[in-house]
């Protein structure tokens, strides 16, 4: 019930349409139930008695019932489609908006392939189930109840067969649903793996081709596809028993009614049961059993959708690990940064801390260089500044205020970060750059690109800043992508600029030009540069050396060459490589 309550919030403006669907269905059912009654009267009062006026009367009423049922059926179908499609639209929107609220820690819990599956396949399953619930799950019970009443009014004795058939079907359906649900849960988890394989293959197609690993990728895809096939086979193998069980009950009931009904007509001389009544009873029997069949289909669909609904609610229930305090500050005073005894872990485990007791002061407008090996905690350190994660212990202060006391939107608006993985979106270069500032003028865009050394190569494109960037930026080089991302960050005009190894694909000459532009054009901005090349940070006001989540050394280029063994080793290895 809790899942239903949470999902029902997404109905919203489609609530009235969802209510009107069952209302139309009730009228549709009433007119359909009257049809066998009219047929019985046509046979007994019209055809058997040779009464033409009765035949015309009941024939006309029969046609009117059919037409009325058809009209209400069309209305209910249209309303149902509108309600279910609208519900699915709102559900996807609610999930997507919820994901936008996630912190990095929340996002780390779900793979992108899993989120895509939940937004597409799972929502479609829930949409189909909702459609069946407000239409068939309403229609079938009403039809069943009215048909049972009409059948018992026609012949109580013969209708007793339904009291045997219905429990048999109910027990069988319960067993089928409970056993198949386990496999449906598993199959949707495997769908996540399938999407992951497809996503990795498509985004890494150039790597696959360059290493001639097509066969390996095909085998990997086939393996996951086979797993889905086998799991679905198990689930559908159980569900497949539903139809034979239904048919057995239907044919058994029909045989019983025809045999004993015919005997009653013959033995009683049509005083206990007439031919018309037997005809209507058979029609009611078909209606009752078809309703049971529809209900069984609904139960199977709901069973499948239940697994999807649980996965959707996981997304909706996930609360962001980052929240504003009660009265957050709406201003960042300056670009000074202070780390006070900061420790940090991606998981709540003190033994697996990736940052330990970090103490660091970065004056506003200064340039800090960060050097260190892979996994030393460089990226983790800078991700705490815009509060992408919260510290485990200690505090990070910007402009003298704890980042947890500053409004998240305000904080991130004053910190521009170019991540290790450079991301460009589908659209023109100009549209991508305006992610940094949607109000940026063409002159501001060009100026930012000049600082990032992106303008020279953009001018070589036929459409220049209106050049379309393919998905993932596949039609620009790695270095070009990095420079566009730096330009985008500069358009924010931030108080703090963080480059997380963002010039690794840029040649040393261009790298030097970018650093010179920063020094000359944005002297008041605090600049943090993570790099593998010492040449990228040697002009910084201060350089820190990270090792094992700790600051191993801190000072200028000259100081670290004299005092820090790790820095000296990196410098010597790079200078020897340059000499060779």
Segments and roles (model prediction):
Residues 3, 12, 18-75, 79, ...:
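Transmembrane helix-loop-helix hairpins at lipid-water interfaces of multipass membrane proteins
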Residues 12, 23, 27, 31, ...:
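Hydrophobic alpha-helical transmembrane segments of ABC transporter permease domains
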Residues 13-16, 101-105, 121-134, 138, ...:
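An intracellular "coupling" helix at the cytosolic face of ABC transporter transmembrane type-1 domains
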Residues 16-18, 65-84, 135-142, 163-190, ...:
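Alpha-helical transmembrane segments of multi-pass membrane proteins
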Residues 23-24, 31-44, 65-112, 116, ...:
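Juxtamembrane helix-loop junctions of ABC transporter transmembrane domains
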Residues 49, 85, 93-123, 196-220, ...:
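Short intracellular "coupling" helices and adjacent cytoplasmic loop segments at the cytosolic face
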Residues 51-57, 150-164, 234-310, 315-316:
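Helix-loop-helix
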Residues 331-580:
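ABC-type nucleotide-binding domain
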């Amino acid at each position: 019930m809790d899942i239903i309550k949470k999902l029902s919030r997404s109905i919203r403006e489609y609530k009235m349409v969802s209510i009107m669907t069952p209302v139309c269905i009730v009228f549709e059912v009433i007119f359909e139930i009257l049809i066998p009654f009219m047929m019985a009267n046509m046979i007994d009062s019209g055809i058997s008695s040779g009464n033409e006026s009765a035949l015309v009367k009941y024939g006309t009423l029969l046609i009117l019932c059919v037409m009325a049922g058809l009209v209400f059926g069309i209305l209910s179908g249209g309303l149902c489609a509108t309600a279910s499609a609208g519900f699915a639209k709102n559900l996807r929107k609610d999930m997507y908006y919820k994901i936008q609220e996630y912190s990095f820690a929340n996002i780390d819990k779900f793979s992108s392939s899993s989120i895509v599956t939940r937004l597409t396949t799972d929502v479609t399953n829930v949409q189909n189930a909702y459609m069946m619930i407000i239409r068939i799950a309403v229609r079938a019970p009403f039809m069943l109840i009215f048909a049972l009443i009409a059948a018992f009014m026609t012949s109580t004795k013969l209708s007793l067969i339904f009291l045997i058939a219905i429990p048999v079907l109910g027990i069988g359906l319960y067993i089928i649903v409970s056993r198949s649900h386990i496999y449906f849960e598993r199959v949707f988890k495997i769908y996540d793996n399938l999407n992951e394989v497809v996503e990795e293959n498509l985004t890494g197609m150039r790597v696959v081709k360059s290493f001639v690993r097509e066969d390996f990728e095909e085998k990997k895809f086939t393996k996951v596809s086979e797993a889905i096939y086998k799991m679905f086979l198990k689930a559908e193998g159980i569900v497949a028993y539903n139809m034979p069980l239904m048919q057995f009950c239907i044919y058994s009931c029909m045989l019983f009614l025809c045999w004993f009904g015919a005997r009653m007509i013959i033995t009683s001389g049509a005083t206990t049961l007439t031919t018309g009544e037997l005809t209507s009873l058979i029609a009611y029997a078909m209606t009752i059993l078809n309703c049971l069949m529809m209900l069984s289909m609904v139960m199977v669909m709901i069973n499948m959708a239940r697994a999807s609904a649980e996965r959707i609610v996981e997304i909706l229930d996930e609360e962001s690990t980052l929240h504003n305090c009660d009265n957050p500050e709406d201003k960042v005073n300056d670009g000074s940064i202070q780390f006070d005894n900061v420790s940090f872990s991606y998981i709540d485990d003190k033994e697996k801390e990736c940052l330990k007791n970090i103490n660091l002061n970065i004056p506003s407008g200064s340039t800090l260089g960060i050097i260190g090996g892979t996994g030393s905690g460089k990226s983790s350190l800078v991700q705490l500044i815009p509060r992408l994660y919260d510290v485990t212990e200690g505090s990070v202060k910007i402009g003298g205020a704890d980042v947890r006391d500053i409004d998240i939107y305000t904080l991130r608006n004053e910190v521009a970060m170019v991540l290790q993985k450079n991301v460009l979106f589908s659209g023109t270069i100009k549209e991508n750059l305006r992610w940094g500032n949607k109000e940026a003028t063409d002159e501001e865009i060009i100026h930012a690109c000049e600082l990032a050394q992106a303008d020279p190569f953009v001018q070589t494109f036929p459409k220049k800043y209106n050049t379309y960037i393919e998905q993932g930026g596949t039609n620009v080089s790695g270095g070009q992508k990095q420079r566009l991302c730096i330009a985008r960050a500069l358009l924010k005009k931030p108080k703090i600029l963080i480059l997380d190894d963002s010039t690794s694909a840029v040649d040393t000459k261009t790298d030097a030009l970018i650093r010179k532009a920063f020094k000359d054009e944005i002297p008041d901005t605090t600049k943090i540069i993570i790099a593998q090349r010492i040449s990228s940070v040697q002009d910084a006001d201060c350089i820190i050396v990270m090792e094992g989540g700790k600051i191993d050394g801190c000072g200028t280029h000259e100081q670290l060459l004299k005092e820090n063994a790790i820095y000296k080793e990196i410098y010597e290895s790079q200078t020897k490589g340059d000499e060779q």
